[in-house]
């Protein structure tokens, strides 16, 4: 039986009360042209609505620049919650018992990051991905008790990270040794590495994916390092870990320390920051882990609570013997990352990673067919890739910008041997129309 709430008599009585003679008169403010619309477009999800509104912005440019900072769709709820007064601070509380809500959130963040990386322990965050890598190198030397003062660093590690790493560790008499990458594959040549003398080295850094977007042979590199008594420091993109093998499962024993940039997890691009670094490690090394650690415990009445644990490692307890001088960390960004991961869940994060990879592969294939554009490396990629241009890369970037496209990151300064190399990034924010616009713009220039 159909549910009909109002009979014709009911409608007439209601119209009489409000002084309208008919339904048409009641809705006379609606333009008559709209009355004959037969088709209403299908509904959009939040990401679709965001893209629709951004297209109406006259100066909005399509951004295909990655190089360590990535544009992903961030649900509106993330920062709506993160900027509530209860969370809106960068500080980790010193008096743990006074801020149980904040500590519980950080504890949940640590749990999710440890699970995502398949590691035992996570800290509460570090300043950014570059300083996290430097902290990981210092941690490796401490674990080796200073007997090894050399860190092996592939040239395929983010060049900005390498500069920060060198600036910090070389002041402590730790040598950074650069390992060249294979010019055709874009990754560490594992066969050449096997012939390398690893004596006196504390650790090797393994990026995944590397700066070129290529996927390193992580299992082979990890097993080689452990066979030569080196620690393995994994520097990873957290979004990629939703698709790829997590560092804790690399090789036979897994990575020893994992670090990286947390910006892809719900933190928007903002002229370089603030972002946040993350770090995880094996349980055996937790006392050398820098930064705050939140633990779960019970009080004397048996009630569950959260507290800052292992504080003897930190500078506010023993400054001269602290594992680091990380003070405020990036608590607010961690709040956003926790909300982001909670909203997306494992399935949602995997969908973001898969969409980024799929769209990147699509653009790679499109550009491979453009005259004057050639792929540089043959290794599998995640969501970035390198092409070589016939024309000077600066001219191409300027011409693309005039057409509303930030086309990528020039490799000319950091990797001059690659010539007119261009690093291009594609994420889940890019549609098929965006990829076509990039292809057509590049064809018109080349």
Swiss-Prot record:
One of its GO terms (biological process) is glycine decarboxylation via glycine cleavage system. One of its GO terms (molecular function) is glycine dehydrogenase (decarboxylating) activity. It is an enzyme of class 1 (oxidoreductase). Pfam families: GDC-P. Its EC number is 1.4.4.2. It comes from the Bacteria. Keywords: Oxidoreductase. It catalyses: N(6)-[(R)-lipoyl]-L-lysyl-[glycine-cleavage complex H protein] + glycine + H(+) = N(6)-[(R)-S(8)-aminomethyldihydrolipoyl]-L-lysyl-[glycine-cleavage complex H protein] + CO2. InterPro entries: GcvPA, GDC-P_N, GDC_P, PyrdxlP-dep_Trfase, PyrdxlP-dep_Trfase_major, PyrdxlP-dep_Trfase_small. The glycine cleavage system is composed of four proteins: P, T, L and H. In this organism, the P 'protein' is a heterodimer of two subunits. Belongs to the GcvP family. N-terminal subunit subfamily. The glycine cleavage system catalyzes the degradation of glycine. The P protein binds the alpha-amino group of glycine through its pyridoxal phosphate cofactor; CO(2) is released and the remaining methylamine moiety is then transferred to the lipoamide cofactor of the H protein. This is Probable glycine dehydrogenase (decarboxylating) subunit 1. The gene is gcvPA.
